[in-house]
Amino acid sequence: MIQPQTLLNVADNSGARKLMCIRIIGASNYRYAHIGDVIVAVIKEAVPNMPLERSEVIRAVIVRTCKELKRDNGMIIRYDDNAAVVIDQEGNPKGTRVFGSIARELRQLNFTKIVSLAPEVL
């Protein structure tokens, strides 16, 4: 579960390393974000000489959470970290690579470009 002030790792090569969630996109009363939700975040740590810089406000989609994700078939998926992929206004990733595994639920939420870049889909 991701809420405002949560720190996340970045799972792509866009230039950001750490993000802090500041808002969850959707209904005004959303308290937590889960896998596949879009958030507004601020970059807390970035790689030098890259397009994205520190203290820049961006959009990102959650691809991994420490909180368990229960599927309809009874399978439970849990990751070791909270991670997100930086996206633009149209929902396309800003980076050209995605690191680590991502959940299959992103394909159902029309993030097919992110799914195609991922090395492993669980």
UniProtKB/Swiss-Prot annotation:
InterPro entries: Ribosomal_uL14 (IPR000218), Ribosomal_uL14_bac-type (IPR005745), Ribosomal_uL14_CS (IPR019972), Ribosomal_uL14_sf (IPR036853). Keywords: Chloroplast, Plastid, Ribonucleoprotein, Ribosomal protein, RNA-binding, rRNA-binding. NCBIfam families: rplN_bact. It is found in: Plastid, Chloroplast. This is Large ribosomal subunit protein uL14c. One of its GO terms (cellular component) is cytosolic large ribosomal subunit. The keyword rRNA-binding applies. One of its GO terms (molecular function) is structural constituent of ribosome. Part of the 50S ribosomal subunit. It comes from Nymphaea alba (White water-lily). One of its GO terms (biological process) is translation. HAMAP family: Ribosomal_uL14. The gene is rpl14. Belongs to the universal ribosomal protein uL14 family. Binds to 23S rRNA. SMART domains: Ribosomal_L14.
